[in-house]
């Protein structure tokens, strides 16, 4: 399925920004050229996460596993343009499932492991997904049984495939089927893949992002749209073939897929997986797996330098660079990692929709600049960054719609170019608001022009009413809608409370009905049990308030609520 307009495809290919190579082409190239090199490594704690024994595979062994998975999925009717929801942690089987579905021309819809029945039911309904792949348990939660419960209310969902030591009734136990694949099944899958005529412009994924709308929005991306994002990562971090990459970010969105999965395929690297985040295990993997590149949140990098005992015995001899972002970086952290350990920090600003601004040492050598500034791409200045002429930016006054050309004045960042998607999945009304009249995508993020020559942009805030907790976008409107259904709640407003580790945590200001109240525990029990929302969307701070502050037209003044949190004044 191709959703990118043909004129865009032709334009980007004529400029040499897009090509005809698919992600499967990249994979098969490495299978041919480096069959016995190590390709992928399970997390140290894989057994605790999903059961079984952690594994490590060569490119040849990975190829055999992909062939078997493709054969089983094809035998159950999965083919071109079918949407398959995948809910798996960062284990080897996740990459294998991705590659098998890519081989068949199916569309992958990755779901965070934190999603529960509410979110899963929505994305299955929205995409018309025909199948789901999960593990019987992920950690302590029974995901196989959960998806079987969703299946009873999802008429399009034909199959739930399950990995693990047990399998719930009615689901399909993948492991014995994978072991029993025969030549006939293998040849049938090969024939189906060939006849599907998969192109680099076909959709690979529909990832999910939360904005101001109550429900998550699907972001479709093609092979070409993923490859150019991966190329930006490889270029910014100066990665080379054969490197060893450590991935602690869930492979469900831009951060996890472009920095790990796609970069791995571009480089023929070794992909070492990590999840859930565990600092001692993370450091152990850097040491034992001889890692060349990884990514981490700013708070983690600050913590390491503030507690050097954590770094005892860790050899940074091979670690060349670390990617970070999603929150402001510390100049001290960027400088210290380089001067003391020889590790360069790359500051990334990006989004599922395709905003991509790497601030790397090649273009921004000053640690103080790199911590807060991003190259102003697409305005004629030549940068070393490969994306410098492939993405275009402008800042616009959100009130007047006039372009901002002077420094120090905040404006909404708008982008277009070869990295930017063409629109949300089956959401024409939202798309009409998401792009302006000239085709620029409205990011909802506020930046200002900076630098002596206005050569940089600096993030200053968000227009969107979104809370970013540990890299996960959470729609405050969604949570407010759920809170409105609580029998004791008259009205509620949800904002982000600053947090040094996660960036933000959820804080709810609640007006209770007369003579009624509820505790934080009761509110969260209602959200997780009655509304079945993901655990990471729970309220972490509850403030009781007599009335929500509003402007003259009735809009809730969330800035005042955030100010109350910052001042420590209870409402």
Named regions from a protein language model:
Residues 76, 106-180, 298, 514-516:
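Structural core segment of the AMP-binding/adenylate-forming
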Residues 287, 322, 329, 334-456, ...:
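Conserved AMP-binding/adenylate-forming
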Residues 35-38, 162, 167-168, 172-175, ...:
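Conserved pre-ATP/AMP-binding loop-to-beta segment of ANL
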Residues 162-163, 532-556, 571:
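AMP-binding/adenylate-forming catalytic domain of the ANL superfamily
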Residues 115-122, 132-134, 294, 417, ...:
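AMP-binding/adenylate-forming catalytic core of the ANL superfamily
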Residues 1-57, 61-76, 166-168, 192-194, ...:
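N-lobe entry segment of adenylate-forming
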Residues 17-19, 39-91, 95-99, 116-121, ...:
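Conserved AMP-binding/adenylate-forming core of the ANL superfamily
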Residues 227-244, 252-293, 307-308:
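Conserved AMP-binding/adenylation subdomain of ANL enzymes
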């Amino acid at each position: 399925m191709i959703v990118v307009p043909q004129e865009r495809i032709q334009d980007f290919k004529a400029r040499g920004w897009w090509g005809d190579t698919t992600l499967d082409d990249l994979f098969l190239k490495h299978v041919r050229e480096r069959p016995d090199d190590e390709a992928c490594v399970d997390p140290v704690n894989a057994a605790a996460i999903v059961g079984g024994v952690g594994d490590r595979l060569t490119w040849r062994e990975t190829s055999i596993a992909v062939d078997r998975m493709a054969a089983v999925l094809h035998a159950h009717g999965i083919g071109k343009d079918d949407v398959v929801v995948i809910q798996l942690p960062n284990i080897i089987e996740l990459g294998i499932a991705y590659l098998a579905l890519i081989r068949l021309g199916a569309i992958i819809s990755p779901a965070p492991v934190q999603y529960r029945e509410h979110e899963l039911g929505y994305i299955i309904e929205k995409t018309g997904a025909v199948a789901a792949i999960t593990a019987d348990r992920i950690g302590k939660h029974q995901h196989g049984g959960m998806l079987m419960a969703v299946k009873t209310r999802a008429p399009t969902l034909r199959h739930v495939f399950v990995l693990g030591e047990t399998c719930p009734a009615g689901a399909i136990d993948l492991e014995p089927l994978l072991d029993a694949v025969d030549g006939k099944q293998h040849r049938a899958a090969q024939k189906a893949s060939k006849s599907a005529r998969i192109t680099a412009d076909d959709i690979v994924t529909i990832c999910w992002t939360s904005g101001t709308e109550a429900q998550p929005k699907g972001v479709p991306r093609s092979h070409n749209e993923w490859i150019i994002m991966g190329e930006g990562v490889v270029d910014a971090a100066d990665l080379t073939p054969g490197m060893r990459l450590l991935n602690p970010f869930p492979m469900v969105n831009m951060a996890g897929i472009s920095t790990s999965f796609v970069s791995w395929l571009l480089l023929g690297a070794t992909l070492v997986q990590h999840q859930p985040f565990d600092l001692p295990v993370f450091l152990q993997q850097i040491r034992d797996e001889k890692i060349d590149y990884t990514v981490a949140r700013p708070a983690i990098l600050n913590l390491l330098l503030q507690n050097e005992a954590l770094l005892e015995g860790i050899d940074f001899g091979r670690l060349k660079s670390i990617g970070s972002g999603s929150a402001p970086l510390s100049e001290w952290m960027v400088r210290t990692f380089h001067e003391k350990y020889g590790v360069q920090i790359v500051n990334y600003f990006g989004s599922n929709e395709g905003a991509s601004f790497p601030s790397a040492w090649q273009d921004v050598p000053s640690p103080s600049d790199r911590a807060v500034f991003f190259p102003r791409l697409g305005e004629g200045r030549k940068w070393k960054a490969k994306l410098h002429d492939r993405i275009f930016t402008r800042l616009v006054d959100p009130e007047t719609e006039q372009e901002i050309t002077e420094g120090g004045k905040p404006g909404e960042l708008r982008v277009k170019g070869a990295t930017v998607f063409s629109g949300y999945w089956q959401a024409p009304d939202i798309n009409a608001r998401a792009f302006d009249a000239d085709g620029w995508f409205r990011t909802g993020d506020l930046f200002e022009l900076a630098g002596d020559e206005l050569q940089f942009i600096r993030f200053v805030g968000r227009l969107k009413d979104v809370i970013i907790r540990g890299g996960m976008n959470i729609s405050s409107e969604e949570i407010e809608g759920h809170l409105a259904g609580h029998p004791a709640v008259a009205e509620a407003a949800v904002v982000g409370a600053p947090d040094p580790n996660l960036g933000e945590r959820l804080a709810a200001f609640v007006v209770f009905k007369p003579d009624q109240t509820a505790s934080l525990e009761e509110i969260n029990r209602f959200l997780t049990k009655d509304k079945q929302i993901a655990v990471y969307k729970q309220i972490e701070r509850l403030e009781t308030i007599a009335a929500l502050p509003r402007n003259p037209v009735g809009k809730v003044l969330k800035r005042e609520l955030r100010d109350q949190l910052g001042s420590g004044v209870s409402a």
